[in-house]
């Protein structure tokens, strides 16, 4: 994100910030696992909010852009261990949300984990700090907003993008459903269809 911003907002010859800044429209397209039984494999999810469990964004001044009420609700409902750092919640670009939304896409609250195994509740040999965390996230509800999916990018993209003045939106093709234990029969097809859907929406 910093590199993309530097391409348009930093004079690379003088290494100084430009006087007139450019705001980018950034759409992330990726894959994710659903946390809810009614969001099936091969469906699409638009992240209205990104929940950062990675602590990365806490290195920046995010108080003015974070959704503190949702953060507090998540901490309380999951009995979050603050030794892991304070979770952060950042909203998506409302402009891009309006351009991409339709009845073909779910909207929701996306968890951003700091790793693939333990941070997402997976166990091989190492025990994890809270074996019940995934179940707690599945049942999280804040004024009707549920946690829909879990991946590793959205929270940071939303936070850095908003701090830098860019419009960001994260979209996911669901290739696994943790609630039902099912998997996509053709994840590449699901991603291709999401790419086509998004490009058509942006072009119109």
Regions found by a protein language model. Give the residues of each.
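Short glycine-aspartate micro-motif
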Residues: 24-28, 149, 168
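Zn-dependent metallopeptidase/amidohydrolase metal-coordination segment
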Residues: 155-187
């Amino acid at each position: 994100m910093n590199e993309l911003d530097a391409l348009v907002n930093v004079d690379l010859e003088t290494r100084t910030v430009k006087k007139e800044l450019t705001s980018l429209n950034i759409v992330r397209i990726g894959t994710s696992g659903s946390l809810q039984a009614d969001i099936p494999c091969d469906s699409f999810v638009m992240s209205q909010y990104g929940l950062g469990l990675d602590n990365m964004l806490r290195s920046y001044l995010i108080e003015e852009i974070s959704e503190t009420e949702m953060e507090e609700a998540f901490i309380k409902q999951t009995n979050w261990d603050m030794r892991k750092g304070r979770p952060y919640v950042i909203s998506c670009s409302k402009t891009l949300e309006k351009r991409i939304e339709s009845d073909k896409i779910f909207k929701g609250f996306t968890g951003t984990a700091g790793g693939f195994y333990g941070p997402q509740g997976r166990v091989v040999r190492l025990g994890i700090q809270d074996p019940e965390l995934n179940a707690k996230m599945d049942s999280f509800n804040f004024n009707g907003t549920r946690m829909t999916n879990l991946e590793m990018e959205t929270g940071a993209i939303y936070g850095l993008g908003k701090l830098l003045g860019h419009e960001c939106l994260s979209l996911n093709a669901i290739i696994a459903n943790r609630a039902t234990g099912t998997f996509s029969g053709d994840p590449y097809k699901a991603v291709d269809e999401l790419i086509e859907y998004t490009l058509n929406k942006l072009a119109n």
